[in-house]
Design a protein with these regions (language model features):
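Extended, charged alpha-helical "arm"/coiled-coil substrate-binding scaffolds
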Residues: 1-144
Length: 144
């Protein structure tokens, strides 16, 4: 994966996913700030105290780099899966959902989907696909 990543040049990122990830990172840090801030602590001070970002722009720059790296990884995983006919079944997604449900005290896959919506199928499916691709890469590297 690292060799592929280092030799890849991404020209564009899927705008809808990119924008959604940036928005989610911002929303999550703002929610965290509201929950854990000290009295009279500004958002900028919270970012510095908790994460070491000197400015909000510095956090935004990190968010952009993180999102680009995540999407690059995702695109590489999809390409490797496609080229090697690695697939994910609905049973794989349900099993992963049940694992996550147990980990986070839900009654099962259906509870997670009910709480977070059908987009969880995409998240769970990608998680399974990522694991299968990494297992595939390990298997071919061991054979060399």
């Amino acid at each position: 994966y690292e060799v592929i990543s280092n030799n890849s040049n991404v020209k564009t990122y899927p705008k809808d996913i990119y924008d959604s990830l940036i928005s989610t990172l911002g929303d999550n840090i703002k929610k965290e700030y509201e929950e854990y801030k000290e009295e009279d602590q500004s958002f900028g001070d919270y970012l510095y105290d908790e994460y070491g970002y000197k400015t909000i722009d510095e956090f935004d720059k990190w968010s952009e780099e993180y999102t680009q790296n995540y999407l690059k990884q995702m695109m590489i995983v999809y390409i490797i899966a496609y080229e090697n006919k690695i697939t994910v079944s609905s049973e794989d997604i349900i099993n992963k959902g049940n694992e996550q449900a147990e980990l986070y005290d839900y009654n099962g896959y259906e509870d997670i989907v009910t709480e977070y919506g059908n987009e969880m199928n995409t998240e769970l499916g990608y998680s399974v696909l990522y694991t299968k691709v990494m297992d595939f890469l390990v298997s071919i590297s061991i054979g060399e």
